[in-house]
């Protein structure tokens, strides 16, 4: 049976703004308080989705969250009508309103961890929504994420959904941004690669000193258990604490994997050689042969990797067996990174082509091509069971671009978030979106 890996990209929400909410994310912090353009952000994301669809890749779309999060503000003590809640929050605690308006759910690499059916004990595709416990503005996402994923992958014969892990620091889980799967073929058993920043309970593991390590070993192990993964099909690797302190807040900022290829920076991991040996051995047992591409620090510094988001790229398999690397424009603008990429495709490497995309609105908030997509490997029967409304087609692209043009503002500053009309505009847009994508009722305002 044929299998493919589908990229489900996050649709940027109507409240996209530069709130500077993500401590440890250099781009997010450095662009704080700038004026954002939600319409441009959403259209840039849709353009990438359509381009990959046009290249022959199966492409999906994942809906944004309801923002402002009025229910969350009520939980924190603001009372009155929805408009009064927003007005009071703006007057009394503007940073909290900014957090409650974040469009960070666009980075769906953090939405969940996904294990394909070939790896799981019960032969179903498993999803665990990420608790994103490290940051308030992201910790409020998982209830809606779970409902949206449930509406997209509804057939219990093929799909299993798990709620987020307990929302405490010991089980901090950032989803697929710290998870990669290696395999010889998407439909065959593979090796799932979980990267953690620290251990909550075992002091033998080092931890970063400046910025928080958002993913714990304990969370990664819990997800592997929930998904019914075998010990022989899992490798746990620790991210280098020194690079976390340089702004590498997720593993997908310093490494990317696909198929049998791991593309990573020399400083990405601790104990790199033993980890590679374990990965090579376990992948070999399921018929694969690891190809590790190490980018030397002498050619690309960690700082340049973070600035350009070289590793926050999409590594995609083409029908001829070669790979395509999707990178943001910032890679082309960085001399050392671009020179390295030219050497990479000229060498005898699996990467045959580099394709550049303008994702500036997302990049300025700290999210590149890989942040914007959730990968789901599916067999033909499983793909047929996915809600067809969320699979990108030329007509759906046209419908969504028109929807964005109708509902999105072209300017969003902190003051705009206090406008009570914004809530009405967002709910109107999302209500229409659930009909376009055939999701049913998934947002709090639709459920109440």
UniProtKB/Swiss-Prot annotation:
Its EC number is 3.5.3.23. GO terms for biological process: arginine catabolic process to glutamate; arginine catabolic process to succinate. It is an enzyme of class 3 (hydrolase). The active site is at residues 174, 250, 371. Pfam families: AstB (PF04996). Pathway: Amino-acid degradation; L-arginine degradation via AST pathway; L-glutamate and succinate from L-arginine: step 2/5. Catalyzes the hydrolysis of N(2)-succinylarginine into N(2)-succinylornithine, ammonia and CO(2). Belongs to the succinylarginine dihydrolase family. This is N-succinylarginine dihydrolase. It comes from Pseudomonas savastanoi pv. phaseolicola (strain 1448A / Race 6) (Pseudomonas syringae pv. phaseolicola (strain 1448A / Race 6)). The lineage of its organism: Bacteria, Pseudomonadati, Pseudomonadota, Gammaproteobacteria, Pseudomonadales.
